[in-house]
């Protein structure tokens, strides 16, 4: 396995561990999700360039579109939560109140 794949998998794992461990603020959770999406995008781009399949070139673009949608929804939720509650702590959110 080339070292670039190991680095990308380690970046994904570090973002996943950050998402699971540092869940106190909503903004830090969003940043960890963006790190995961960035590492998946780089991995999909490198794999599609190495495989030379014509249909696989659209996979990174579709992944980038979903990452942009996830970012927009996450920032909209962050603005709404900070406007309603005054802070972005995840512990203060309760899904039963919505």
Curated annotation (Swiss-Prot):
Q: What does this protein do?
A: Core subunit of the mitochondrial membrane respiratory chain NADH dehydrogenase (Complex I) which catalyzes electron transfer from NADH through the respiratory chain, using ubiquinone as an electron acceptor. Part of the enzyme membrane arm which is embedded in the lipid bilayer and involved in proton translocation.
Which gene is annotated as encoding this protein in its UniProt record?
A: MT-ND4L
* Pfam families on file: Oxidored_q2
Q: What's any one GO cellular component for it?
A: mitochondrial inner membrane
Subunit-structure text:
Core subunit of respiratory chain NADH dehydrogenase (Complex I) which is composed of 45 different subunits.
Q: What is this protein called?
A: NADH-ubiquinone oxidoreductase chain 4L
| Gene3D superfamilies xrefs | 1.10.287.3510
Listed GO molecular functions? Answer: NADH dehydrogenase (ubiquinone) activity
Cite the entry's keywords alphabetically: Electron transport, Membrane, Mitochondrion, Mitochondrion inner membrane, NAD, Respiratory chain, Translocase, Transmembrane, Transmembrane helix, Transport, Ubiquinone
Family assignment?
Belongs to the complex I subunit 4L family.
Tell me the organism.
Galeopterus variegatus (Malayan flying lemur)
**What enzyme category does the UniProt record give?**
translocase
**Taxonomic classification:** Eukaryota, Metazoa, Chordata, Craniata, Vertebrata
Bilayer disposition of the protein: Multi-pass membrane protein
Q: Which reaction is the catalytic activity of this chain?
A: a ubiquinone + NADH + 5 H(+)(in) = a ubiquinol + NAD(+) + 4 H(+)(out)
Primary location group: mitochondrion
Keyword flag Transport: yes
Sequence intervals crossing the membrane: 1-21, 29-49, 61-81
């Amino acid at each position: 396995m080339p070292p670039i794949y190991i680095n990308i998998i380690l970046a994904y794992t570090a973002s996943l561990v950050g998402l699971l461990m540092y869940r106190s603020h909503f903004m830090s959770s969003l940043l960890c999700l963006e790190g995961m999406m960035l590492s998946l995008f780089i991995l999909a781009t490198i794999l599609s360039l190495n495989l030379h399949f014509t249909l696989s070139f659209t996979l990174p673009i579709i992944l980038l579109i979903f990452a942009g949608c996830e970012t927009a929804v996450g920032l909209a939720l962050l603005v709404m939560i900070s406007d309603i509650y005054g802070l972005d702590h995840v512990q203060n959110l309760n899904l039963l109140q919505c």
